[in-house]
UniProtKB/Swiss-Prot annotation:
<dbReference type="InterPro" id="IPR001750">
    <property type="entry name" value="ND/Mrp_TM"/>
</dbReference>
<feature type="transmembrane region" description="Helical">
    <location>
        <begin position="217"/>
        <end position="237"/>
    </location>
</feature>
<keyword id="KW-0679">Respiratory chain</keyword>
<feature type="transmembrane region" description="Helical">
    <location>
        <begin position="119"/>
        <end position="139"/>
    </location>
</feature>
<dbReference type="GO" id="GO:0005743">
    <property type="term" value="C:mitochondrial inner membrane"/>
</dbReference>
<feature type="transmembrane region" description="Helical">
    <location>
        <begin position="193"/>
        <end position="213"/>
    </location>
</feature>
<keyword id="KW-0249">Electron transport</keyword>
<feature type="transmembrane region" description="Helical">
    <location>
        <begin position="25"/>
        <end position="45"/>
    </location>
</feature>
<keyword id="KW-0472">Membrane</keyword>
<feature type="transmembrane region" description="Helical">
    <location>
        <begin position="287"/>
        <end position="307"/>
    </location>
</feature>
<feature type="transmembrane region" description="Helical">
    <location>
        <begin position="144"/>
        <end position="164"/>
    </location>
</feature>
<comment type="similarity">
    <text>Belongs to the complex I subunit 2 family.</text>
</comment>
<feature type="transmembrane region" description="Helical">
    <location>
        <begin position="88"/>
        <end position="108"/>
    </location>
</feature>
<feature type="transmembrane region" description="Helical">
    <location>
        <begin position="250"/>
        <end position="270"/>
    </location>
</feature>
<keyword id="KW-0520">NAD</keyword>
<protein>
    <recommendedName>
        <fullName>NADH-ubiquinone oxidoreductase chain 2</fullName>
        <ecNumber>7.1.1.2</ecNumber>
    </recommendedName>
</protein>
<keyword id="KW-1133">Transmembrane helix</keyword>
Length: 307
């Protein structure tokens, strides 16, 4: 590991920290761009041929959305303009950055070109600031909240339907991201972002690590964990979001879409989970791994729910 790679990795991490510790829109935007530039520069330095095309596509989309966000953010946060047009465009660009329906078109093409480490950075670290901005936008009207809610639940269902027709692991992770973006969107407006992001982030990181290591037993269990199947901890995260959303006027629609997306998603998660499980050699270690994985998931999930 070279000094350059360490510095660029630090940029990826320090960008979100800078944004979330400032109340100035320009500083928030600069932090957002620091992490993006650090990510792109790092993988150009590493010369990842396979992921080069995906990263450039990601960079173009993020650059366009960031430019539009900067201009609209100046009107909203600096000039305190209350125009619905500026607010609508700003939220639209946030959804493009995150990859939420109907602006999810780039997720699967980009994910299919990225390594598992890249997917973790794009799906978690570079998503922190846009989600944080969405959660702390005090100028959002009730109409905009209802719109975000509807798009979130649609993203949940649409991502689940896309995943049914995919057969490659990276593409399935992309479809899963679209679904979880819907859950993250709902957690932002319900004030439960921290708990859901922690459970989702932990489940995704564990899966990506085991995919990199090629541990089939652990991959199988990690897929079930990412699906939100009880008693895994992501189930606790989803229940917490639904309980918070029960206070809104659209609670029935949220509940119906959430159940539908969860059931549909579970089908393709189970398909891949069973595939990895059946290809694994039968030995006593798998029972030990299963017990330990379940224990950690259930314990962590319950502790988070009780906090």
């Amino acid at each position: 590991m070279t000094l350059q790679s360490v510095l660029l990795g630090a940029m990826i991490i320090l960008g979100p920290i800078l944004s979330m510790t400032s109340s100035n829109w320009i500083i928030i935007w600069i932090g957002l761009e620091i992490s993006l530039l650090g990510f792109v520069s790092y993988y150009m330095l590493m010369k990842k041929i396979m992921s080069g095309e995906g990263i450039m596509m990601y960079f173009l989309i993020q650059s366009v959305s960031s430019t539009v966000m900067l201009l609209n953010g100046l009107y909203i946060f600096v000039n305190h303009a209350s125009s619905y047009i500026y607010l609508f465009i700003f939220i639209t660009m946030l959804m493009l950055k995150i990859g939420m329906f109907p602006l999810h078109f780039w997720i699967i093409p980009v994910y299919s070109k990225l390594s598992y480490l890249n997917i973790g950075i794009v799906g978690l670290l570079l998503k922190i600031v846009p989600m944080w901005i969405l959660m702390h936008m005090g100028c959002i009207t009730s109409e905009m909240l209802n719109l975000i809610t509807m798009l979130s639940v649609t993203s949940m269902l649409f991502g689940a339907l896309i995943g049914m027709n995919l057969s490659k692991m990276r593409m399935v992770l992309g479809a899963s991201t679209i679904t979880h973006n819907g859950w993250l969107g709902m957690s932002c407006i319900s004030g439960s972002l921290f708990k859901y992001f922690i459970t989702y982030g932990f489940s995704l990181v564990i899966l990506l690590v085991f995919l990199y290591l090629g541990d089939k037993m652990s991959i199988s269990l990690s897929l079930l964990s990412l699906s939100g199947l009880p008693p895994f901890m992501l189930f606790i995260g989803k229940i917490n979001v639904l309980l918070m959303m029960m206070e809104t006027n659209l609670w029935f629609i949220v509940l119906v879409f959430a159940i539908l997306s969860a059931v549909i998603s579970l089908v393709y998660y189970l398909k891949f989970s069973v595939m990895f499980f059946m290809n694994m050699k039968n030995n006593y270690l798998k029972h030990y791994k299963m017990a330990m994985f379940l224990l950690v998931n259930v314990t962590f999930g319950m502790l988070l729910f009780l906090t």
